[in-house]
Amino acid sequence: AGPYDRIGLHRYRASGPSVATLLYLPGTNMNGAAALTEEKYNLWLYLAARGIEVYALDYRTHSVPPDASPDQLKALKDWTSAVFVADIAAAADFARQTGGHDKLFVAGFSRGAFLAYAFANTAPDRVAGLVVLDGPFKALSAGAFDRAPSLADLEASGTWASDVGGSKGWEARQALMQAVIADPDAPAADPQFKSIGDQLAHVLQTAWLPGGLANPEGGMSRPAVLARLLKDYDRWYPAVQDVDGKTIASSANAPETDLDDLWGKFQTPILLFASTGMGGDWVINAVHSAVHSGSGDVTLNVLERYGHLDVLVGEQAAAEVFEPTAAWIKARAP
């Protein structure tokens, strides 16, 4: 094992016995540490206060330092989705044994939703239900995807890690988040905005589709809250998992992997939340992944005007995501 081949688990619980155990799988570049400690902005704390014990995972990426060199980042070359699913299985076994529930619920946000589906494919006897927070597993009308050339391109580039800093750079990203956290009403670095909070709101509003990443300009979330969430991201993520995702999404049963072998024959209950801000194809694929999974117990929630991050930290998330999730889990707790 290399220096970064380790995972972590954060346990969130109230005093007294729990009614259920939930394993939470973060999105790309996210981790299991509580960046936000108010219950209305943190699903883990909301559930824990209501008797649902939560174990939030740190992927191996949490161990990789932000200033890792290209040579050090070669460690991410073999961090495939299958490797992460094996890590998730180890975390699930620990959570089951520690929490005292033979079956656990698994929640995943974004890429974590993809990994939640994959884990449930490999360990259906251990999963009481899936909480899918704005993420697809399969695509309704994906074209054929040839994995080999994509892997060859990765090999040729030598870029085994994607950088959440993007074109603006990690340091500039972090400085913007820190400035908004310190005082969202402070003057903006860009004079076209009246405050640094407004500047971040516009950056997030236009990062993907308009309102796709978040919809603060539409009043669905607050820049200062989003900044606190984003500041604690991990910088690096294995690029090979983008290839894995396209491989699995492109067919009902990808021959290159066993991570989707049970899709279409699922018997696991599924609770889905999908944000409209991510676009029509995103919603269609998220719904398709749940409805055609094979499960006879699928609950769908399409969140109008929500951006991706608003599902976690939006002003209405506690009422429209957290509360229904708690009720759904309690109704299905073994």
Which role fits each region the language model picked out?
Residues 258-259, 297-334:
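Catalytic active-site module of serine/aspartate enzymes centered on a nucleophile-bearing elbow/loop
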Residues 274-303:
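Conserved loop-alpha-helix segment in the C-terminal half of the alpha/beta-hydrolase fold
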Residues 15-62:
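Short, surface-exposed "cap/lid" segments of acyl-processing enzymes
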Residues 113-124, 130:
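Short glycine-enriched nucleophile-adjacent loop
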Residues 1-17:
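N-terminal cap/lid segment of alpha/beta-hydrolase-fold proteins
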Residues 146-278:
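Alpha/beta-hydrolase
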Residues 99-110:
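Alpha/beta-hydrolase fold nucleophile elbow
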Residues 74-98:
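Alpha/beta-hydrolase active-site loop
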